[in-house]
């Protein structure tokens, strides 16, 4: 009896573990399947040039290439194994195959989102790819040197040595007048400094004499 109960509990535990293990596998697949089956490829091409969108589809798989405008998809070409291709999308010049398409004579309006969808023989979706195409505008044409005309105008001026000397001589008194005391000669500066020193010395002597006289001659108050 006890052995039957223990075997029953073991069976229940194993079944629960199996269910839990399968649940974890399904959860992992649900999380990572969109990443595996869908990716974004960024491509760019020059304006007026060509660009090729390459897929990982094999030649024995049918492929549907389309352009996405944000709300709806427009079929570019449908490559069906053994039946060739069709290009119903107006405005694109391209060559189409299962593993790639090439868009010729790119314009700025060709920038946008493109998609590729591959099918197996049973019709099931094998993989899905997104392409983000950016068409780079042509650089602005620069003007060559031969097409540029340079106009040079000259103004005749006559400057003599004598006139330059006269002009400099006439400016000298004005500069000295503006500078004032600083532009005087060293001899004049020394004379002024000596006079200032004598005046200050005499003033100090007078102040000292007056101070002593007031101190000696004043009568003390009783």
Swiss-Prot record:
SUPFAM superfamilies: Immunoglobulin (SSF48726). It is a single-pass membrane protein. Keywords: Glycoprotein, Host cell membrane, Host membrane, Host-virus interaction, Membrane, Modulation of host dendritic cell activity by virus, Secreted, Transmembrane, Transmembrane helix, Viral immunoevasion. GO terms for biological process: symbiont-mediated suppression of host dendritic cell mediated immune response. The chain crosses the membrane at residues 193-213. Glycans are attached at residues 50, 56, 60, 71, 105, 109, 125, 132, 147, 164, 168, 189. InterPro entries: Ig-like_dom_sf, Ig-like_fold. Highly glycosylated. The keyword Transmembrane helix applies. One of its GO terms (cellular component) is extracellular region. It comes from the Viruses. It is found in: Secreted; Host cell membrane. Belongs to the RL11 family. Interacts with host FLT3. Plays a role in modulating the host immune response and affecting host cytokine production. Structurally and functionally homolog of host CEACAM1, induces endothelial cell angiogenesis. Ligands for host FLT3 receptor, activates the PI3K/AKT and MAPK/ERK pathways. In turn, triggers hematopoietic progenitor cell and monocyte differentiation leading to virus reactivation. This is CEACAM1-like protein UL7.
């Amino acid at each position: 009896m006890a052995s039957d109960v223990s075997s029953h509990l073991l069976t229940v535990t194993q079944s629960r573990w199996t269910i839990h293990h399968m649940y974890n596998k399904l959860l992992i697949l649900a999380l990572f399947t969109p990443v595996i089956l869908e990716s974004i490829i960024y491509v760019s091409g020059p304006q007026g040039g060509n660009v090729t969108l390459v897929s990982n589809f094999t030649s024995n798989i049918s492929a549907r290439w389309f352009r996405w405008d944000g709300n709806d998809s427009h079929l570019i070409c449908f490559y069906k194994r053994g039946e060739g291709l069709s290009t119903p999308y107006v405005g694109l010049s391209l060559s189409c195959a299962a593993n790639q398409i090439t868009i010729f004579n790119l314009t700025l309006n060709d920038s946008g989102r493109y998609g590729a969808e591959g099918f197996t023989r049973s019709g099931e979706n094998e993989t899905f790819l997104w392409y983000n195409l950016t068409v780079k505008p042509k650089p602005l044409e620069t003007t060559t040197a031969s097409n540029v005309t340079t106009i040079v105008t000259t103004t005749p001026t006559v400057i003599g040595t004598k006139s330059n000397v006269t002009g400099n001589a006439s400016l000298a008194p004005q500069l000295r007048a503006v500078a004032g005391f600083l532009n005087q000669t060293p001899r004049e500066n020394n004379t002024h400094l000596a006079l200032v020193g004598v005046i200050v010395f005499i003033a100090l002597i007078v102040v000292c004499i007056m101070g002593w006289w007031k101190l000696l001659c004043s009568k003390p108050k009783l």
